[in-house]
């Protein structure tokens, strides 16, 4: 099964707009019981989340998991920091790469694979404003070409 396949529960669309994603890593995530139930219900948001390496471990910050509706008073904190599970070699490689200027770890997708929640983590370099404008121009041009092609096909 290729990386990132499975039932996608949440996607960080802004990540591809704000970063050049160079590499991706599939990571496990440590969750509490009410968190996984809420995630399976699709009540999760990756929009402003980011990953950080602290004390040789990778942690995911600002991922919002809504409290489980049928949960009791022991429900989880929606914005708590969650640990990501990776191999030591991968973590060591990421430590070296993130120390370089401009690289950061960005969660791209949250999905289920064989019953386990997985996070697709991307190693990205921040885009400048002119890069974003260039991407928008390229996307608009592609859309115009497809529209013209579709219109020419309908004419025949």
From Swiss-Prot:
InterPro entries: SmpB, SsrA-bd_prot, SsrA-bd_prot_CS
Molecular-function GO terms, alphabetical: RNA binding
Mutant lacking the gene: phenotype: Not essential for growth; loss of trans-translation. Significantly decreased growth at 16 and 52 degrees Celsius.
TM regions (residue ranges): none
Assigned GO CC terms: cytosol
UniProt main location, coarse: cytoplasm
Compartmental location: Cytoplasm
Domain of life: Bacteria
Induction: Constitutively expressed, part of a 5 gene operon with multiple promoters. Not ethanol-stress induced.
GO biological process: sporulation resulting in formation of a cellular spore; trans-translation; trans-translation-dependent protein tagging
Keyword terms, alphabetized: Cytoplasm, RNA-binding, Sporulation
Gene3D superfamilies: 2.40.280.10
UniProt function note: Required for rescue of stalled ribosomes mediated by trans-translation. Binds to transfer-messenger RNA (tmRNA), required for stable association of tmRNA with ribosomes. tmRNA and SmpB together mimic tRNA shape, replacing the anticodon stem-loop with SmpB. tmRNA is encoded by the ssrA gene; the 2 termini fold to resemble tRNA(Ala) and it encodes a 'tag peptide', a short internal open reading frame. During trans-translation Ala-aminoacylated tmRNA acts like a tRNA, entering the A-site of stalled ribosomes, displacing the stalled mRNA.
Similarity annotation: Belongs to the SmpB family.
Listed name of the protein: SsrA-binding protein
Organism: Bacillus subtilis (strain 168)
Upper taxonomic lineage: Bacteria, Bacillati, Bacillota, Bacilli, Bacillales
Gene name tied to this protein: smpB
